[in-house]
């Protein structure tokens, strides 16, 4: 018989797992990894002279640059690489692979975590422990990706974004929110991996077993 078990710690772990996967996915697809300084627009009119454009944003896969026309101020946003081989740097290609693998694992864990309220074990293995192990592995992939990412700052696109950019030196560029989100998400991934053990303890406690023995199909312990 299926028992729905909800505890404070298991729900918190589930929510954190979903948040981490979503944050890493959004950061990966964002163009806000490197932010270049705003460049001066050149125009024929007096009003256009000396006008600063929006900053230049460069991500691992995406780019957002301000339109340089005199009239239009819309930004151009999208992926700059039509194929994997067109990614700006070999280091960024490796970063994309490691981050993609890590994010895929996190998304799978986030999906499975929703069903842990109904199913707590498979083949006598705790789902919480298995998911915690997978989150730890995903965190290692994310760390490798984040370590390799600054090594690609010497590529031409990074130099176009900001002068004096070189490996592990952003030059005139600054780091955007996507990099910090990915870094924070990586830290939170390891926290989730450790906290999964607490979720396992909470759902297999004596109080939960007592509720099940009383014939309750819905066990809610906060």
Curated annotation (Swiss-Prot):
Q: Which Gene3D superfamilies match?
A: 1.20.140.150
What compartments host this protein? Membrane
Name of the protein in question: LHFPL tetraspan subfamily member 2 protein
Specify whether Membrane is a keyword of the entry. yes
Q: Specify the superkingdom.
A: Eukaryota
Free-text tissue specificity from the UniProt record: Expressed in the epithelium of the vas deferens (at protein level). Widely expressed. Strongly expressed in heart, spleen, liver, kidney, thymus, testis, brain, lung, intestine, vagina, ovary and uterus. Expressed in follicle cells of the ovary, epithelial cells of the oviduct, both luminal and glandular epithelial cells of the uterus, and epithelial cells of the vagina.
InterPro entries the UniProt entry points to: LHFPL
The record lists its disulfide bonds as none
List the membrane topology term(s): Multi-pass membrane protein
According to the UniProt record, one GO cellular component term is: membrane
| Key words of the record | Fertilization, Membrane, Transmembrane, Transmembrane helix
Look up the record and give one Gene Ontology term from the biological process aspect.
development of primary female sexual characteristics
Cite the Pfam families for this sequence.
L_HMGIC_fpl
TM regions (residue ranges): 11-31, 97-117, 127-147, 175-195
Where is it mainly found?
membrane
